[in-house]
């Protein structure tokens, strides 16, 4: 199963260097957001994609993300950090894996 990343240029470049299978860059123009929606729909329908990493800001602009079991769609912070804040991320991790993250 492939790991795919979608996001801004800096985030995508970092994941390319880390060895993700496929990476797609988008800016925040209306045309680019529409392309991102179409690419996400295409990726969700593919059988070879296991994880889609998408920056929080791009996911927010796209709107409703598909609710599917596979591939797993994970929202990740970009170079500016999380738009949801640290507390919400802790809560999400606690619910997902049952472990609370503390500093």
Curated annotation (Swiss-Prot):
Gene3D superfamilies, alphabetized: ATPase, V1 complex, subunit F
One Pfam family of this chain: ATP-synt_F
Coiled-coil intervals: none
Disulfide pattern: none
Keywords from the named record: ATP synthesis, Cell membrane, Hydrogen ion transport, Ion transport, Membrane, Transport
One example GO MF annotation: proton-transporting ATPase activity, rotational mechanism
Record's subcellular location: Cell membrane
Protein name per the record: A-type ATP synthase subunit F
Organism encoding this protein: Pyrococcus abyssi (strain GE5 / Orsay)
Lineage per the UniProt record: Archaea, Methanobacteriati, Methanobacteriota, Thermococci, Thermococcales
């Amino acid at each position: 199963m492939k790991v795919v990343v979608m996001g801004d240029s800096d985030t995508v470049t970092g994941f390319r260097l880390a060895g993700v299978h496929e990476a797609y860059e988008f800016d925040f123009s209306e045309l680019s957001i529409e392309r991102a929606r179409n690419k996400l729909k295409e990726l969700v329908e593919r059988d070879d994609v296991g994880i889609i990493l998408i920056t929080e800001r791009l996911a927010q602009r796209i709107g409703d993300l598909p609710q599917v079991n596979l591939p797993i769609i994970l929202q990740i912070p970009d170079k500016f950090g999380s738009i949801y804040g640290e507390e919400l991320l802790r809560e999400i991790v606690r619910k997902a894996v049952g472990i609370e993250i503390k500093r």
